[in-house]
């Protein structure tokens, strides 16, 4: 899939993988702004255009077995999901919304807001890899109200019901 982008900052870095097998693409900060005490907004200097292609969307497992096919012409909403990198623990920062969703209709600069919850630890600076993105999608959902739901072994067991 091709994701088009517009460079909004001369130092913007095209999202990249360190290793070909990596699941997500790293993004690099081109700007930083403290928008409230210990709350930092980082821009990546890029805007995206995310579109489905003319072909069917086919998703396969690692063995090549197809387990989802969305025929051309079916409604599929595509997004980029921005999430923290695993090394975030070294910064004392927390991504404000855990995972940010960049909708396919958004055309502004992609940015991320972090809480610097441990001010004695370093925070991100311009030029740092501040997060990672991956393609996400959702299919249309119709909600149907029923009087009863089917039984399962788990039933209504909620928080902690499956063990430690």
Name each model-derived stretch.
Residues 1-164:
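DUTPase catalytic domain/fold
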């Amino acid at each position: 899939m091709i994701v088009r982008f517009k460079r909004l900052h001369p130092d913007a870095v095209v999202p990249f993988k360190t290793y070909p097998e990596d699941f997500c693409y790293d993004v690099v900060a081109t700007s930083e702004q403290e928008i409230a005490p210990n709350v930092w907004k980082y821009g990546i200097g890029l805007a995206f255009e995310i579109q489905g292609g003319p072909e069917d969307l086919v998703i396969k497992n690692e063995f090549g077995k197809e387990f989802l096919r969305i025929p051309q012409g079916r409604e599929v909403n595509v997004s980029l999901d921005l999430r923290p990198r695993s090394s975030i623990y070294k910064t004392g920062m927390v991504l404000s919304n855990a995972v940010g969703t960049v909708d396919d209709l958004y055309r502004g600069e992609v940015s991320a807001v972090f809480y610097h919850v441990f001010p004695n630890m370093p925070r991100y600076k311009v030029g740092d890899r501040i997060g990672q993105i991956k393609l996400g999608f959702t299919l249309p959902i119709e909600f149907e109200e029923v009087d009863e739901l089917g039984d399962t072994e788990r039933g209504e067991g909620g928080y902690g019901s499956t063990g430690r």
